[in-house]
A protein has these predicted regions:
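Single conserved hydrophobic/aromatic residue that forms the stacking wall/gate
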Residues: 2-13, 295-306
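Aromatic/acidic polysaccharide-binding cleft in carbohydrate-active enzymes
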Residues: 16-70
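A cross-kingdom feature marking solvent-exposed beta-strand/loop segments within repeated
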Residues: 72, 150-151, 161-191, 297, ...
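Flexible inter-domain linker/hinge segments
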Residues: 84-133
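Extracellular and analogous surface-interaction loops
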Residues: 140-150, 157, 185-190, 267-276
Length: 306
């Protein structure tokens, strides 16, 4: 073992453990044989310090995320062959799913979220996302703030999980549950102003005490003046923003270049002569999601919304 690489040592230990169980006729399973992908917002999160996991569930499994066999798969297969009844053989390995390259295209249509909101739900008090019949996606809380000659501090308690704060449509701050952030300094306001808090739900903690992982703003939103007085904000308009292609598709899209500072849907289309698996390069990505709709025709037309 001393002359082998770390990966080779791990393989030796794994295969040795499997062989020992097979020699003793012990049943076992591999976690994971194929990890795959957690699509949408179905990813989990670690506990106690909230840490959402990515949508990739590859797990360095014998069958990788895209369904291809790995050297690990072949090694496990070779081991299992030794324990087959005489005359039996393992089934042949299926061919890999074909892959294709998508032609270059632009996300050249834009629908600004604040211009495309659904009908709001009215709530006296702040409530979690689940209270508004939504389990994942994003949710927008909106209320009106009174005029103030001085700066004030906005205190958001337990925003789960990633919040953007806007005042009269202008973005003031981003608050992350991962970093324990929850306060924003508000500038003086000459008149009543619109406060928007857009909260995105990320992975849910799925074990232990953290299993009751409500999303949205789960406790309260308060306004603190310079003299220390704290007021709980009431009278909210709440907008459900689900992770749903039809919701994103039925928006007013237009050619527009000045939306960088606003949450928005960006749409582009491309045409394929043949279909196959493909992969998005997310190296320059920041925050968001990708939805894809396939129009079956000849050739095939795809619409991508991010």
């Amino acid at each position: 073992l001393h002359s082998t690489s770390r990966r080779q040592r791990q393989m030796c230990i794994r295969d040795r453990g499997m062989k020992e169980m097979l020699d003793r006729n012990i049943s076992f399973s591999l976690y994971m044989t194929h990890g795959g992908t957690s699509f949408g917002h179905w990813g989990g999160a670690n506990f106690p310090n909230f840490s959402p996991t990515c949508t990739s569930y590859d797990y360095d499994a014998p069958i990788n995320e895209s369904g291809k066999v790995t050297p690990k798969f072949l090694e496990v297969r070779d081991l299992l062959k030794q324990y087959l009844p005489e005359g039996e053989e393992l089934a042949p390995i299926p061919d890999s799913i074909p892959t294709i390259a998508v032609p270059e295209f632009k996300l050249d249509e834009v629908a600004v979220l604040f211009d495309n909101l659904p009908e709001p739900k009215i709530s006296k008090d702040i409530k979690s996302m689940e209270a508004f019949d939504q389990g994942w996606g994003s949710i927008l809380y909106r209320t009106t703030l009174p005029a103030s000659k001085e700066e004030q501090t906005l205190i958001i308690t337990e925003a789960h999980d990633w919040a953007q704060v806007f005042l009269n449509g202008k973005k003031l701050a981003t608050l992350s549950r991962l970093k324990g952030e929850g306060t924003v300094i508000l500038p003086p306001m000459k008149e009543e102003s619109r406060l928007d808090i857009l909260v995105e739900a990320m992975g849910r903690m799925n074990f232990g005490k953290g299993i009751y992982d409500w999303k949205g703003i789960t406790e309260k939103v308060e306004l603190q003046s310079n003299d220390g007085n704290i007021t709980s904000l009431k009278d909210w308009q709440v907008y459900n923003i689900p992770v749903d292609y039809s919701f994103a598709q039925n928006k007013k899209y237009e050619k527009r270049d000045n939306t960088e500072k606003y949450p928005a849907y960006y749409r582009g289309t491309f045409t394929l002569d043949k279909v196959g698996d493909t992969f998005l390069n997310m190296m320059n990505w920041s925050k968001g999601m990708v939805l894809s709709l396939i129009h079956i025709s000849e050739p095939t037309r795809h619409s991508l919304i991010s």
